[in-house]
Amino acid sequence: MDRQLVLDLPHRPAQGREDFLVAACNEDAVSWIDRWPDWQGGSLALYGATGSGKSHLAEVWRARSGGVLIDASDLTVSAVPEIARAGAVILNHADAVGEEVALLHLINLLRQDGGFLLCLSDEAPGRWNTQLADLRSRLVAMQSVGIAEPDDHLLGAVMLKLLSDRQLRVPLEVISFLVARIERSFAAARTMVVTLDRLAAGEMRPLTIALARKALAQMAEISNNSAS
């Protein structure tokens, strides 16, 4: 497909279960999503770094459960009854809930009615800065599973998928070149893909090792400027 045409298309990542890249760092999380509705207490906390795949797994679960996605900033005591009526709720940024009593009510109401709750956060519930004692005890008791940072194999696979989502093709030697040089994290992989996409579009050239070197240099410059 012509690159000019690709630039005019919206970027829509593949979010199906079959599109999720399973590896040692995330296989427990995948197993728990697949295990639904057999969740103890009807709730699960899924935590991991930005870009680790929490949102992808949540979308898989939402499609299966018919659940609703709520951001923690929108969770209020008055909104709880309406939210709980969905029967299955994904709470994004659950570690940043402003009204702790609202989350406590949501947990209790969903459990009472046989509903389900999937909490997404960067840290495990036991590490949240929770002030309400009753909520803290519920969170500590909640089944939780984390996604660790990727190994080299998954890091390369993640970059390939993100590039494919953007309709970009890249030789495997370029991926190997980058995996050996970028930080081993989902965030670094995502930033690299965005940088490569921008450079390839601006220079109207294929993704090569030369372009990858330029992307690495740009990322290093941004990092150095941020640190200074």
Spans of features found by a protein language model:
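Conserved C-terminal helix/linker of AAA+ ATPases
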Residues: 200-218
